[in-house]
């Protein structure tokens, strides 16, 4: 397990270094860097699945520490995934603004019944208002993604905590009644998390409907 863990840990640090390259990359190379980072993140998630299996096969006196190390790696890579998505969202928003600005400047607006040109200032003001609405919706969607990512991270943390509690309970020889109570609480937490995710989606939908 240790060699695979060290490789994965090293790869996480390499991705953190690559994230800094995104801010300085030009338009031609930024997509290449993004794809490289995403491919590395996907590979780490695959390795984490293998590490989880290996950690469960560790001796009882090493199992808890092994799972803690795997959980920490999982937490780090999930934050890297969120950071990459946030960067891509900001980049897409900038590119969309640039395209709309270029289209607006290259387009001549005329009325239907005369050759009177619509004042450019009014057109720019209208476009600016639309852009603010789009940016507000994009920010709302991004916040929703971050909330859902946080809920997924919380679920993984609760799942890992449940495993640790059950392992400790087995070592201490707790009764079946106590074990069932622990499992019941974990089951209830799962439904609370799902309810929170659904509520977030409903709120996002209602706000988007209101803005549009």
Swiss-Prot record:
Superkingdom per UniProt: Eukaryota
Residues exposed to the Cytoplasmic side: 1-190
Keywords recorded for this protein, A-Z: Acetylation, Coiled coil, Congenital muscular dystrophy, Disease variant, Endoplasmic reticulum, Epilepsy, Golgi apparatus, Membrane, Neurodegeneration, Protein transport, Transmembrane, Transmembrane helix, Transport
Segments passing through the bilayer: 191-211
Coiled coil: 61-107
Reported impact of residue 144 to W: In EPM6 and MYOS; no effect on protein stability; loss of localization to the cis-Golgi network membrane; loss of function; unable to rescue the yeast strain lacking the ortholog Bos1
Motif IxM motif boundaries: 118-120
Vesicular side stretches: 212
Classification via Pfam families: V-SNARE_C
Protein location: Golgi apparatus, cis-Golgi network membrane; Golgi apparatus membrane; Endoplasmic reticulum membrane
Gene Ontology terms for molecular function: SNAP receptor activity; SNARE binding
One Gene Ontology term from the biological process aspect of the record: intra-Golgi vesicle-mediated transport
Family annotation (InterPro entries): GOSR2/Membrin/Bos1, SNARE, v-SNARE_N_sf
Membrane topology according to the record: Single-pass type IV membrane protein
UniProt keyword Acetylation, yes or no: yes
Annotated GO CC locations: cytosol; endoplasmic reticulum membrane; endoplasmic reticulum-Golgi intermediate compartment membrane; ER to Golgi transport vesicle membrane; Golgi apparatus; Golgi membrane; late endosome membrane; membrane
Disease linked to the protein: Epilepsy, progressive myoclonic 6: A form of progressive myoclonic epilepsy, a clinically and genetically heterogeneous group of disorders defined by the combination of action and reflex myoclonus, other types of epileptic seizures, and progressive neurodegeneration and neurocognitive impairment. EPM6 is an autosomal recessive form characterized by onset of ataxia in the first years of life, followed by action myoclonus and seizures later in childhood, and loss of independent ambulation in the second decade. Muscular dystrophy, congenital, with or without seizures: An autosomal recessive muscular dystrophy characterized by hypotonia and elevated serum creatine kinase levels apparent from birth. Patients have progressive muscle weakness, areflexia, and may develop seizures in early childhood or have abnormal epileptiform findings on electroencephalogram studies.
Function: Involved in transport of proteins from the cis/medial-Golgi to the trans-Golgi network.
Family: Belongs to the GOSR2 family.
Subunit structure as annotated in this protein's UniProt entry: Part of a unique SNARE complex composed of the Golgi SNAREs GOSR1, STX5 and YKT6. Interacts (via IxM motif) with SEC24C and SEC24D; mediates GOSR2 packaging into COPII-coated vesicles. Interacts with BET1.
Name of the molecule in the record: Golgi SNAP receptor complex member 2
Organism for this UniProt entry: Homo sapiens
């Amino acid at each position: 397990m240790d060699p695979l863990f060290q490789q994965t840990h090293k790869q996480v640090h390499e991705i953190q270094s690559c994230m800094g390259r995104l801010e300085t990359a030009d338009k031609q190379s930024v997509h290449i860097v993004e794809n490289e980072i995403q491919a590395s993140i996907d590979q780490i998630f695959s390795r984490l699945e293998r590490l989880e299996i290996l950690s469960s096969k560790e001796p009882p006196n090493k199992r808890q520490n092994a799972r803690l190390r795997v959980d920490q790696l999982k937490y780090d890579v999930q934050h890297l995934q969120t950071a990459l998505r946030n960067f891509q969202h900001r980049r897409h928003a900038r590119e969309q603004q640039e395209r709309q600005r270029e289209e607006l400047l290259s387009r001549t607006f005329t009325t239907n019944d005369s050759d009177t040109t619509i004042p450019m200032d009014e057109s720019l003001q209208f476009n600016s208002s639309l852009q603010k609405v789009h940016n507000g919706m994009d920010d709302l969607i991004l916040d929703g993604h971050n909330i859902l990512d946080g809920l997924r991270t919380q679920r993984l943390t609760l799942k890992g905590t449940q495993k640790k509690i059950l392992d400790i309970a087995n070592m201490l020889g707790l009764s079946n009644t106590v074990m069932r109570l622990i499992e019941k609480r974990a089951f209830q937490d799962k439904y609370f998390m799902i309810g929170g995710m659904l509520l977030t989606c409903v709120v996002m939908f209602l706000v988007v409907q209101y803005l549009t």
